[in-house]
Structure formats: C-alpha cells, structure tokens
From Swiss-Prot:
GO cellular component: plasma membrane
EC number: 7.3.2.1
Name listed for the protein in its UniProt record: Phosphate import ATP-binding protein PstB 1
Organism: Synechocystis sp. (strain ATCC 27184 / PCC 6803 / Kazusa)
Gene label: pstB1
Keyword ATP-binding: yes
Residue ranges of coiled coil: none
Binding partners and assembly: The complex is composed of two ATP-binding proteins (PstB), two transmembrane proteins (PstC and PstA) and a solute-binding protein (PstS).
Record's catalysed reaction(s): phosphate(out) + ATP + H2O = ADP + 2 phosphate(in) + H(+)
Length: 269
C-alpha cells in the first residue's frame, strides 16, 4: 500500500483538505491516516468495498458523525483552510453551507412546496419563499414536473422525483457543497440517469462529493475519484484507508496502485 496516495493536480481552488485523518468509534479506529484535497466545482467520487469508511469520511465534512456519541476524530478537516472541528465553529452554519442528500429519498410529511422551503423558513430566510422554491426546483430539474401540484404531498412523487425533491431542499439552503451518500442506490435506471445528469449541471455552482458502490456511475459523473480499501484488525474489525486519489480517468484507466487495479477490474469488492 502506498502511504502517500497520488493527489490530483490542484488547478482549482480546494474546498476541503483532510490531514492525517483518523476516525474512531470508542476505541475502534474505523479510518486511518486519510489526507486528500477536494477541488471546487468538481464532482469527486468515493469508491471502495463495504466497510472502508467512505460514508464515515463523507459525514465528517458536515459533522454528522457528531451525532454518534462514541465518535472522535484526530487530524484535521479543513474547509477553505478553516478547521471544521475547531471549538469556535458554528455547526449549524456548517450544515447550511454543506448540504446532504442521503441514500434513500427522505421527504418530510409535508407538501412539495413546504419540503423545499422548510430549512430556509426555519433559519429565518427573509426573501421570497415562492421564488426560492421555484429556483430550487428548477435547479433540481423538477419544476416542470411539479409546478402545478406544489400543494401535493412530497410522498405523492415517484422515488426518483422524491430524490430530486431532497436535492431541491438542500439547494434551497444555498449551500456551497452537496454531499451525496449513494443517492441513486434506491432508484431505477431511468431515475438514476436523471440524477446523474442533474449532478453534471449542478457542479457549475456547487462542489459535489458522492459515495457510490457503482463504479460505472463514478466513471460517468466524477471528475476525481478516491478509492478506499479496508483491512481486518486483530479484534476482527475493519479499518479503512485511502489507496489512491486522482482524476477519474487516471484511477480507472491507469491506476498506480495494485489494490486499485484489482478493485476497478472486479477482482474483489
């Protein structure tokens, strides 16, 4: 294993930087020594087998792991060079600027309109909520499908529409970053294609990090790819680590590490 995985060229502004990141749950180290830089207005995919820490690392970027009592972190997670885990950080503000889209669509038991503007309303948004809802739904490529039924329940939509509604809800908070944890795993192929097309449109205005088990999806949407692997510990747990991080074409077409070659060729995973 290469202890200093290849880093992509930093021709764009870095949004996140991790430095020697270790993640623990109680005494168990779940992730070890991850150092990487996430570039602005690009799509970065996290790939790797189950248990390698992809989602755990993703949740560090908006501090969702804080909700797990046994969680602790060593090393640094920097957002525009600011330490996200500094005692002075406003975690609520972090989650405003760094939105999250989960594996399964999770609309609220509210109307389509109220789903979109919920976060903005709760946070005291002073602008026009109707304009915000329309703009967010347009950005999420959903407006034309729901503009005549904004008072209908979010649950009335198809699975793919619900996921785009959740993306619209995240966009309405006017974030800089969208974190997506396997956003297409519960969707059919047609809905998946729509979400992938949407991601490519959104990267003009947002930095996107996506966790995916689907390597074909990573090759279709990601500008950069980070491959993680895991190894067993003496106690029978797994610890994840970063193997390789580079442009997606390089990771899949000319990987530098044998582990990466084995994974992308389907030899394990």
């Amino acid at each position: 294993m290469n202890e200093s995985p290849a880093q992509p060229l930093t021709e764009t502004i870095p949004v996140f930087t991790t430095q020697n990141l270790d993640i623990y749950y109680g005494s168990h180290r779940a992730v070890r020594d991850v150092s990487l830089t996430i570039p602005k207005n690009k799509i970065t995919a996290f790939i790797g087998p189950s248990g390698c820490g992809k989602s755990t690392i993703l949740r560090c970027f908006n501090r969702l792991n804080d909700l797990i009592e046994s969680f602790r972190l060593e090393g640094k997670v920097l957002y525009h060079s600011q330490d996200l885990y500094s005692p002075n950080i406003d975690v609520t503000a972090v989650r405003k600027y760094i939105g999250m889209v989960f594996q399964k669509p999770n609309p609220f038991p509210k109307t389509i309109f109220d789903n979109v503007v919920y976060g903005a309303r709760v946070n005291g948004y002073k602008g026009n909520l109707e304009e915000l809802a329309e703009d967010s739904l347009r950005r999420a490529a959903l407006w034309d499908e729901v503009k005549d039924k904004l008072k209908a329940s979010g649950f009335s939509l198809s699975g793919g529409q619900q996921q785009r509604l959740c993306i619209a809800r995240a966009i309405a908070m006017q974030p800089e970053v969208l974190l997506m944890d396997e956003p297409c795993s519960a969707l059919d192929p047609i809905s998946t294609l729509k979400v992938e097309e949407l991601m490519n449109e959104l990267k003009e205005n947002y930095t996107i990090i996506i966790v995916t088990h689907n390597m074909q999806q990573a090759t279709r949407v990601a500008d950069y790819t980070a491959f993680y692997n895991a190894e067993a510990t003496d106690k029978g747990n797994k610890v994840g680590y970063l193997v390789e991080f580079d442009r997606t074409g390089k990771v899949f077409g000319d990987p530098q590490e044998q582990e990466t070659k084995d994974y992308v060729s389907g030899r394990f995973g």
